[in-house]
Structure formats: structure tokens, C-alpha cells
Amino acid sequence: MKDLQKLSPEIVTINQSFEMEGADMDKMLIFFYEDLRAIGDSWIMDSDWIYRSKYKNSGVGKNKSDRLVEHVLAALDGLIKTTRERFGMMDLESEGRKSFTTPKGVSSEARRSFTRSASYSESNNSFYPSPLTPRSVLPGTMMMSSNSTSPSLWNLRAQALDRLSPVDLKRFAMQILSQRDSESVSETKIGIEEENEESEILAEEKEEEDNDFSVLETEGTEQEIKTEHHRESSGTEHETEAKDHSEGFETEHHRIECFETEHEIDADDHIEDFETEHHHIEGLETEHEIDANDHIEDFETEHHHIEGFETEHENETEDHSETTTSETDSTESSPKEDVPPPPPLTSPQTPSPTVSTFNTKSSLRSQPPPPPPSPEHKAPAPPPPPPMSKASESGEFCQFSKTHSTNGDNAPSMPAPPAPPGSGRSLKKATSKLRRSAQIANLYWALKGKLEGRGVEGKTKKASKGQNSVAEKSPVKVARSGMADALAEMTKRSSYFQQIEEDVQKYAKSIEELKSSIHSFQTKDMKELLEFHSKVESILEKLTDETQVLARFEGFPEKKLEVIRTAGALYKKLDGILVELKNWKIEPPLNDLLDKIERYFNKFKGEIETVERTKDEDAKMFKRYNINIDFEVLVQVKETMVDVSSNCMELALKERREANEEAKNGEESKMKEERAKRLWRAFQFAFKVYTFAGGHDERADCLTRQLAHEIQTDPDQSESSIMS
């Protein structure tokens, strides 16, 4: 327990060690188990890590002491197993790790171990605070300062830090830098007073070295004093930020120093646990993959931004690189007109300003950069950030910026330095100054109208209340009028439109007469309809383009003209079918006659059925324009078709009688089967006509019975021969 207290003084307190002295074995085991579990819960993300032990707790047949021993062994085994899995993954992936160099000019105070972070939030929800170990990939915020960490624990972390995998290393470092506790107000005031004294001394030295900038340095010193009074009057917010900034530099320099401590690690002992931890790392990488991809391009752009800034202020940086404390003061003591002071904090817990130093992309996204310094007041520039490693330029580094902005409670970040020339052209996600303007569109249409022959006209005044508020000369109307002018010009030059104009002038009188005739036309006689239709077509067929010519005559009844044409075409078609059927010649042979009549019947049958379905609607439309079409022609067509089928049956019976006479005279007929098939075919056609017409007349009914009797009484016919 004393060893655990030395390694983890935040978890295993001294009071617990004293309480165990003189206690019985069961109580000591309980204390020991609780401390082991608290240590494991502080850095192991899996809440069931104890149950992964090979020791299975079973109280069957065991006393209390044995069960306590099993609990302790399970906790130890689970802790060792989880640690071995984590370190095994780190050993195998450490071969591809890049070396890091320690920047010059870092004070000795910066060369120390990382500060521990708490496992839970600042709301004291955690029961077991713990030091940060390599197992923590995404630890929570800190609960204690780094002063409580023992030196032995620092050494242990320094050794374990080098075992981190590249994925864990990036997240581990950024979480440490982002989650720092606020220092006390008294310590911050003392640190700022010392920084002010050193800044004054530094200003005096610069004044002696360079007489050209003496006036500017004096003004800078006076401004620093004013800024200090302003910070003290505004509260502890700015003081806490200055202290955190200084400690952020120290922590980052120590992080880089720890990276170059060890480079050779044996990975053979942990090869079996690699696959298990590899899946865990892949899950973590997948969890942050989207955020990393969103920020990686902007971060690389900002990296070049920082490099350009470092080159621009190289001379001034050399004078300010003696100590990290003086660097922080130089950043905070710049004049107001150069770098605006940070806004007041909204909560006592603030993220470290170091984040803005290493990840200026986050600050650019949260607030606009300050204006460049004026020529009259050139303040000392802040020192450039330490060289950024390739690992810190990855997506996980950028992912921290998103976490920082989310969990920081709207805390301000470090103001970004002024951008060097040409550095902002590649910032993809920066706020653009480009805006859409309706004036450009209006100007375009106005110029287009001017080029098409219309002058530029200003906007009309808004109409008063109750009047039309639409502008008389809007861009759309100007464009339409321009198109009309262009069309008119094309019309004048086109021979086609010239011919149309000639037709208008030539047939104007005939069209006017036709116009009045169509308006007054009404009839019930279909012959009169056909005659009037022919007269109209004889005039209109002479026009080059009927639509274009008639459009020149206002009030021409085009709709009634279309109705007259429809009625005339319909009646003409029905009358043509009727005439064709009446003039149909009934001539032998029967097979050829049936072939022709069946083809024609199938052709007009569908047309007649369509007219019957729509005749009621057509009759209403025709009557609206004083045209009463006679649909009795449909009945005439059906009756005529029945007469044609009756004639076919008579021809079939006639051929049957001739065949019987030949048989009586002793002449054997060689076409008995063919005659039988012709009888059956004539009967089938008669039945189709019966279905189409809806009935038979007396003549057709009598012939159908006779034909059926002949088919039934024919001794030479069989069912198979007829059906074949």
C-alpha cells in the first residue's frame, strides 16, 4: 500500500496507509482491492476490465478471506493484462515513430513531465482521481495540478510515453495541452509582476542597442503598463490566461524532449496481443475520422501561415527568445491597436492558450484575425511556435480543435498573428467577401436592351398606394420587347414571312367573307355540312401558312372551323364505309370473297366501335356550335354489313346445291371436303356480323338456319373435317 501511495498519491492517500496499520487481514485486503480498482478505473476505459481476469470469483465452499483474496487477484490480473495489451501495441507501432527535436531557448522550468489529467469532469463527478498513464487515449479534464505528482511517477510516465502508438501519442499530447486547471489568483499576480519587470528591463536594453526604435519601445513600455492596469481591473481572467500560456509552452517543450529520450524498444514479447489492440485503435481512428478529414486541409494551410510569420519576424524573435516567461509577456503586452485584448472569460475553467499557438486554424475559425500593425506603432512580435512534427499535423491534431471549441464553454482562444502576404488565398473555409447582387443582373438586362435598339431607361418610381406597384420598364419586359424587336426584324427579312404577308393582303376579302360565313353556319343536313366544308377548304388550301395568316384577322372563329372539320371528316368516313359496303360485289369463288370481306370488316370494325363510344360527347360539342350530325349512318353501316353477310351465305348455299346435282348425275366431286369447309366458314362470318350489328334481319336469320341445316345433314362431312 505504501508503494501504491508513492506511485499514485492522488488515489492512495496517506491516511489510508495509516489506517491499515494494525488492521486485520480482511480489512487490509478490502483496502488493497479498492485502491487497485480505483487505479484501474482512472485510466482504463472499459468498465469491465476486472472481469477479464482469469480468476473467476465463486463463493461456493469458500470463506470470506478466500473470496477477498480472489477479488484482489482478479483486480491485479485484469490490471496487468490490460497494461500488457496497451504496451504491446505501443511496442510494435513505435518502430515507425518520427524523432522530435527540442527547440532552443527553452527554460529549464519547461523541461519537466506532463501534468496529470483527471479521469472525469470538473464537476467532481469522479470518486477516484488518478494520474494519466499511456492507456488513456482520450482522457478527461484535470482535477489537480501537476505539483502533486511525485518524481517517481514522472519517470514512469516518461518511460511509458515513448511506448505510445502514433495514434495514441497525438491524442494524448493534445488532451494534455487542452485540459489545464486554473492557477490561483495570487500566484498569477506574482508571475505577471515579475514578467512586467523583465519586460521593462528588456525594453531598456533594446533602447540602448537600437536608437532608431527608442521612441517605439518607450511607447510599447507605457502601453504594457496600461495593459497591466487594465488586466488587473478587469479581474483574474487575463492573468489566468497568461499563466496558462507560459505553462503551455513549458509542457510542449518537455513533450518534445521526451519524444527523443528513447527510440529502440523490443516488440517481440507482445506480438500476440497486437491484433486485439489493433482493432481497438481502428475503432478510435474511425470515431474521429470525419473530424480529422474536415480539418486536415485547413491545418496544413495554416502551417504555411505560421512558417511565413516566423520568417517575417525573425529578427525581432531573437531578442525575445531568452525565457518562456518573457515570450508570454511579449505576446500579451502588445499595443491595443495591434492585437485586440481577449474577451472576458465566461467560466473559471479555460482551455490552454497553447492550443491557439500550435493550432492557429482553430483561432481563425472562431474569430477573425486582428488588423496588421500600423507603421507608427510597431510592437514586438510574439515568438514563433516550436517546429511542428509530422505527427501533430495529422487529423487527430485538428480533431482536438473541434473538441476544444465544443467543451470550452465559449472560452476565447489566442488571437492569431497577422497573416503574411498571399497566405490567405488558400484558406478554403474562410468567410468569403463575395456576395450576389441584383444590380449586376439589372445592368445586364439593361445593356442587352440597349444593344438590341432600346435606350437605357431608369427605374420608375414606386406606385402610390392603391396603384400598380410593378415597374413599367422592368428588366424582364425590356428583354421581352427586345426579343420582339429581333423577331420583327427576322420577319421582315424572311421570304417565308414575306409570303405570309402577301397572302394576308391577297386573300383578305375572301377570308373576311369566310369569317362571317363560319360564324353564321348551322345545319342538320350532313350533305350541306360536307358542301360547306369543301368550300372552306378550297379557300384555306391556297394559303402558305393557314395559322399565321388567320392570326392576322382578329376574331376569326378558329374553334368553330375545327369543329366543322371534325364533323365533316367523321361523317365523310362513315359515309364512305356505307358506300363501300353497298357497292360490294358478291362473286364466286366463295373463299376469295370471304377473304376480302373479312379483311375490310376487321379494318372498320374498330373505328365504328370507337365512334359509338364517343358519339354522345361529340354530339354535345357539335350542338354547341349549331351543328347537328346524324349518327343514323352507324345503323345504316350495320344493316348494310348484315346484307353483305347474307349474300355470302346465299353464295355458299348455291355452291352446295350445285354439288348435290353433280352427285345425282353420277359425277363424283373431288372437292367434297373443301365445300364443307366453305359452308362452315360462311356460317362463322355470319355469326361475327351478328355480334357486331347486334342482330339479324329476317332474311339473314332464314339463311343462317338453312346453312346450319346443310352442315348438319351433309353425310360426307365429319366433325373432324369441319373443325380442321
Swiss-Prot record:
Superkingdom of this protein's organism: Eukaryota
Biased segments, Pro residues type: 367-388
Annotated region (Disordered), positions in chain: 97-131, 187-252, 309-434, 454-473
Biased composition (Acidic residues): 193-212
Keyword field: Coiled coil
InterPro entries per UniProt: CHUP1/IPGA1-like (IPR040265)
Protein name: Uncharacterized protein At4g04980
